[in-house]
């Protein structure tokens, strides 16, 4: 039976199991899932993973999954960005369906296997080191220089040759100040009913701190007690997309030390980047289901609009 009326469910990711990186077991599951995808194709309009998969099958000698070599599936895995759109909006065979298809987490397993074999490119290692890039690029003297060179055509051509970053790709600009440096003492009068700790995220700390400016102003206007979380690290989503799960764990352990005290004290933790919220709300609880601090932070974190809607529903949101 296709699909169902039940809510999609997700299972924890047993990534520390010795069989998780077993390629023979992985390939068997990969081909099982791809065979169902091949027969359905409802997801073809989503990310490039699916057209890539279907083209590989259609151009094979058998016109079936068995006509595609295991190595050719690397392209399909690389094109998945773990956005979950297929899982949440298209696939009729996700759990609790008997076929139990979780395409994004299967791709994550493939990425983890690739990373374990040291196949991650230098470019990807650099681009996913967002804390390092942010600290370097947001220095007052360096930021305008980097922004200037990123607009020069010859420099972008060189960058394309060295790091394979497309010359026409729009790169984020660095700010000459960080959100954390501006709001070292942001906390205002305590409001026991409404108190928020802002997780600035890498992007809005180093690239667009003006978003944090606006967020702080809106919250203060609504008499919300505001604090900025200090000394945090990247949420780990970029490293998750590489399959670098051990680094994800290290980042999580560091951040939990900063986050859990706010969650225990009744703060809502707000992050302005949806993928960062998703990381703490969904991915980390599935990767570390036994960690009580992860579950605690997962319940406390939300995006700004979810929090403002809470105020609106309580009749305390100022609309002026």
What residue ranges belong to the model's regions?
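Iron-sulfur cluster-binding electron-transfer modules in prokaryotic oxidoreductases
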Residues: 101-320
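Non-heme iron-sulfur electron-transfer modules
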Residues: 2-20, 45-81, 93-123
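Local cysteine-cluster metal-coordination motifs and their immediate loop/turn environment
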Residues: 34-52, 77-95, 199-205, 231-242, ...
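A short, structure-level motif marking secondary-structure boundaries and short turns
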Residues: 18-19, 28-29, 62, 199-201
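Short alpha-helical segments and helix-capping/turn motifs at coil-helix boundaries
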Residues: 30-33, 91, 182-185
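Soluble N-terminal domains of membrane-associated systems
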Residues: 1-2, 33
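Immediate flanking context of iron-sulfur cluster ligation sites
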Residues: 24-39, 69-86, 221-231, 261, ...
